[in-house]
């Protein structure tokens, strides 16, 4: 995913600032009739302007203009090279009234006739490893690499130079050191600012080589970036997203298998934790067998009225409550190994290793939470309003071998698809629900009798 955005971090720096860059500067004035009056030259050092002499003007109203030595003064017009590496500055005052014999103080805001752009490469949870920006340049956009301006800094025409930009240093800045976390962090590598013509709107090519999420990355593509506005800052972001699941580790952090280190994966993340105050969710790696209930009484137990459709069931995210809060009959099902085996076994699931304090209690997931697991592998999947509540196949865009590999590669010994009818804590009317990975591009879901023995995946919050 690629975006071009205003660079709010750099907006305060878009103007030349104080002090302005050292160098040679020239100041002239234009009277109300449009006649130019040459004035001062001087040097800027550490924000202090030292003129080469003094300047007297007849009384009148003038617009004052200041340019640095990167701007060529042709007498009746100005010329500036807008390619990377140049930094022309033009400052134009508001009209000033000069009354002799008094001194006049004129201030300038020095502006770039160029735009500034940074390139940023974004990853999540884990930073790009040892990125190398091999090159960054462009197809030459004809003519706009330089420009002619009138004496007040207004652009007149293109200067005939191609708008090729380069980033010779290849320097990339990481926003924060890598630290495994339970929160999905954003890591960025960013270039320094690059100056370019605001009319520059051709394709910009970049080549970045690195490793990320356990894969070698070599991205060499073109993107549209313009047109831009002069004296504005932009940031072009390229976002690298992980196509594989994130894993919950025993120490309460998440990440890819490639950076597991000494950590042990205990689950697949089905809902990311986006801030410290947020709550993430993961599913266990291994299936458990049990029945929803051992008494065939077909009661509404969770909430009254109970969901009546697949769509309503998919909106239920309360598996933890159905496991640990008293049901409508006043029973905490997590505490009932005989009557509610699935709830009890889910609540007592053991991932096989000690876990951190931020990992909560395991529970029997709701139907909606199970759909979140499906969406880990098919982000476009959503239940249909016309789906039957009775056992049926629904279409998804999932290769089941990929699902199985996601579990097996993390140490699971369970066969995840093709057979297990994974029980959920949600009821439709008075019947339990289930949802299962079945075959390529196919799920199998619906309602079942409450005494049906089947398998399920415990879930946990972190």
Language-model segment annotations:
Residues 368-462:
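C-terminal, surface-exposed recognition/capping segments
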Residues 14-19, 353-356, 448:
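Short consensus segments that form the blades of beta-propeller domains
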